[in-house]
């Protein structure tokens, strides 16, 4: 089964991707990781991608698709895979279709923007250990300091309310249209049409996991 997981930044895709991959025994395919590996290994595609990146440009969808096609030929993808971070745009989704890369199920983890802003802007981190707290859901015993060391906690730049709002705006502009695209593809009802399911992304991590696995029939 080939699966695409959609959802805004902070919706919990990373956590749930790990659960799905483990439960179904399929690899999680990260286009970013594959691109870095291809560049490091100096494969023909990696050299081409490095040339583009060194010139300050974005790697084209064509190169990304070629890297994906190479990855899908590997043995661990025979039973399927979970796409991580791809597609991000309708152009990329259409390219997958053109290349005949069939997607079986698209899952959208839906969380309201206000909840995501609360989730992310409330995070505080102890830099040395990586211990993470949340002002509302998992506060430190003493405000502003790590429970174990008493050292100050910080808010990462990525977690500031302003940054989160910007990331959400980009998501709604670029990636949200994919929901409409895949809803339409699912409605076609053809043999190569994916199923599309929206899963409520609030609640305990395990509850969300169970909703997703139920939707996938796992």
UniProtKB/Swiss-Prot annotation:
Coiled coil: none annotated. One of its GO terms (molecular function) is ATP binding. ATP binds at residues 10-15, 123, 132-133, 203. It catalyses: AMP + ATP = 2 ADP. PROSITE patterns: ADENYLATE_KINASE. One of its GO terms (cellular component) is cytoplasm. It is an enzyme of class 2 (transferase). It comes from the Bacteria. It is found in: Cytoplasm. InterPro entries: Adenyl_kin_sub, Adenylat/UMP-CMP_kin, Adenylat_kinase_CS, Adenylate_kinase_lid-dom, P-loop_NTPase. Pathway: Purine metabolism; AMP biosynthesis via salvage pathway; AMP from ADP: step 1/1. HAMAP family: Adenylate_kinase_Adk. Monomer. This is Adenylate kinase. It comes from Chlorobium phaeovibrioides (strain DSM 265 / 1930). The lineage of its organism: Bacteria, Pseudomonadati, Chlorobiota, Chlorobiia, Chlorobiales.
């Amino acid at each position: 089964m080939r699966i695409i997981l959609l959802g805004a930044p902070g919706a919990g895709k990373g956590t749930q991707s790990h659960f799905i991959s483990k439960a179904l025994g399929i690899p999680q395919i990260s286009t970013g990781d594959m691109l870095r590996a291809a560049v490091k290994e100096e494969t023909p595609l990696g050299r081409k991608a490095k040339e583009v990146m060194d010139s300050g440009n974005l790697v084209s969808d064509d190169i990304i698709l070629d890297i994906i096609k190479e990855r899908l030929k590997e043995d661990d993808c025979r039973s399927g895979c979970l796409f991580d971070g791809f597609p991000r745009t309708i152009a990329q989704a259409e390219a997958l279709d053109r290349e005949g890369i069939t997607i079986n199920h698209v899952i959208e983890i839906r969380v309201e923007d206000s909840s995501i802003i609360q989730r992310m802007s409330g995070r505080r981190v102890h830099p040395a250990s990586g211990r993470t707290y949340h002002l509302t859901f998992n506060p430190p015993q003493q405000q502003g300091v790590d429970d174990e060391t008493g050292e100050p906690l910080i808010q990462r730049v990525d977690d500031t309310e302003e940054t989160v709002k910007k990331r959400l705006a980009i998501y709604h502009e670029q990636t949200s249209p994919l929901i409409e695209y895949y809803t339409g593809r699912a409605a076609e009802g053809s043999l190569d049409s994916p199923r599309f399911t929206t899963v409520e992304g609030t609640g305990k991590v395990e509850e969300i996991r169970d909703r997703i696995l139920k939707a996938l029939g796992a």
